[in-house]
Amino acid sequence: MPTTYRIHPGVGVARLGNSPDAFCITPEQPAALPIDCDARGNPLVTPDGTTELTVTAFKDEEGRMKRQAARFQIWAYDDESPNGRPLKLGDHIEGGGNAGTLIDIQWRVYLANKKSGWYDFLQLQGEHGYDPNHPLRNAAITDTNARQRLIIDPGPRTVDHQTNRTAHFTSDNDAYATIFPPPLKPNSIDTLGDLLTDDTGRLLVLGGHGNSGSYLFDDEFGQPRINDYANNDGWFDDTSDGPVMARLVMFSPLVQSVRYVDVEYPAWVVCAYPAYVPEILDVVTMDDVIEDMAIRQFAERTDLYGTTGTFDDPQRIAPTDEPALIHWRAGRLRWNPDYKPWFYRDIWNILYRPDQYNYLCDTLGQSNYPHNQSTRGSFDYEKLGCPPVIDWEAVAECEQRCINAYHSGDLFVEELKAELFPLETSVAGAASGAANAQPRLLTEKRAGKLRDAVAKFARNAIGKSPGKDFDDCLQKWQAASESAAEAKEKLKHEVDEIVGADSAYPEDVANLLSRRVHEHLQKYLSGQLLRDCRRKCIKTNTYDPYGPMRKYLFDLLRAPGEENQFMITGRPDSRVHGLPRMPLLCGDNPMTNELPSKFFRLTDFQYYLLRQWAMGIFYNEKLEGWADPDPLHPYAGWINRTARDLDRGVISNILGGSFCPGGEIGWVMRNPSIWLEPYRIKADRDFSNFGETAAQASAAGSVPDSDYAFYAGEDLSQANDFVTGLQPGDLTKYMSVPWQADFNECSTQTIDVTYEKFNQIYPASDNDQLMKRQQRVWETLWWPAHRPMQTYEQVVPNDSSSITWLDWTPGVPQTNTGDLKMVTEWWRLSVVRSNPSGTVQPSPMGTPGPSQVPYISVERTKRIETKKEEQS
């Protein structure tokens, strides 16, 4: 394969911070701490140089939140490295008919914020296209040119390793006519971030400083107002997103000159709010969402999900072959019923995540025990990870009985009796009022004749003795059966005579009997009865003491299509009857009656994995000796061996739902139309590419930045064009403005569960007292791993005994007033991280004490300290 070059991660994440200079690097593994670095973006490493160090502080010396940079690098793909390898300065590269040494990397990034000029966010409206009458944000501004001013557009920036290592997305750019908001309150916006390259040529993208403000502040107090969790006219924030492109610079010894090679396709960067709980993942991460989409929309794992009958030889379809994918999606698709997930790799992490929410909110702490990892709880990984055990010696003995009974005809007759019993019962019931009772369908005489006929056929087919090896017997049987066409026809004729002899039944019953017997005979001839007998042997000799525990947890899950169902009903004899479905989190729309989706659910792929596990179809890799996982640190062993590992490691730290509108980015991410392939956004090349092609740059020898980097042939669009691709700002524009409003309110939601299809009911309109008395609501969490409710916090420095359970946002209520407070309070909030002096093992009774708290809030910026700093 020709060498290709790609940017990874495909989607990078930068995070806001109000520290003017201090920053770190976003984690590149799931549930990890940020990577510590120096002022030039070079990671700090262990003395042996093998491991990057993580931060010990999330804030600078003055208590201001550090920004987190998204880091990008180039990976090379060729025959030696089909899964990619990191490319380094000094490596040999090829492209454009040239070959040489990599001496530099030019990076081009274009950030923008389109929130204020986009549509109002109204829950799920717009996910499948916007109604022509859907309201716009800042709808009072109607002129197209005027609305263009609602887009924050600093233009593209470029950096490289040799001559221009930093760039800034500021309003004062001589080479590009930028668009920034007018003066705002409480905070104006004059930058969307910065670029820099480290000493190895990798790119770091830093986002904004968390500034949000409105130009509408002429109320009686001279202050802006927030009236909604998602849509607030006049407001802007400095979140952003956009494409990341790279060009390789080589020195070609053949021509003794510099030549240029573009990477295959752009990556994307999202600049979002801080990660306050970096070591606890969401129940569904963005990686889970994209993985599910990759499997069900892009045919990426046809060994797991594909056309019926193809799992032994999975289809292979390129992710960019749209006609083939459309044809595949229209087929008979299903999940592979025989696939065995690994417990610690695939199952335990799904169960582990919600259990960690106990340390982020009061709600679970009061109601969820002993639903935890203690030996008394239902989340005991040693029990849940114990697969069914099969007594293979007993199975072998049972298989021998199957073989002998198959050869003698006993199995044929016994299974036929069981198959005819429902029909015989039905016929007997219909004839119960008749004067003469009907004879049995399969009399002993008839059964004996059938047994003899089948046994005779078996002796002729495979000999007098069936042997003792089950697989060998089955193979010989199938081979003989396929070649004995004349003998099979003779047997079928003989069976016809036996079944039809002396029949005292009406013609319709006799015909039905004949059909059933011949269907059964076909199972016998094909070997199906023998295979079924083996399955029964295995099932009978399988010991699964923890199967009921697995099934109980699975039965609690909210299946696809049950997003509006609160409790499990209709199963009064079940242990789960009357219990709430899980996960008990808010869905994509628990607020309005337009496209309601009250509660959250797992992805289809996660649900499938847990279904296999519940049925006992899984491996425990620890028991098998394949791995030695740490159940209490399920991601500790994550290593980015491939570029896909890096893609997944980064994006796993982004919220994967619910999307109302969501965390960093929203429901647009599950739309396959915005993806070139899984983990790579389809980009509008007019806004992602360098102004000149690599060939033009090679012909010119060198091209200054200003000659091509800042050229713009058209404005950033105020509409979508998924065929062409996404432009800068097209991912974050769906999110709330300012981001602090939705972030503050996504703590809990009161969901009306009275009726499945209605989020809002109005008993007062009809004076319906019965409806009012029967009305039920449930206070439901949104996503505590992003926005905690309560946390453990050490209130006295250096005194672990002072650890106390406190509200995470004291003085900031879940109201519009609280939303406005959050605009200036967000950076003061504490960060929840693993407790260095604690233990992750809960106490035997399930309620952790101070010394057993696994997560603790740190670095809360106290107001009194800030005042002292300002005075000094």
Predicted regions mapped to residue ranges:
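Aromatic- and Gly/Pro-enriched helix-to-coil junctions and flexible linker segments
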Residues: 1-463, 467, 473-474, 480-872
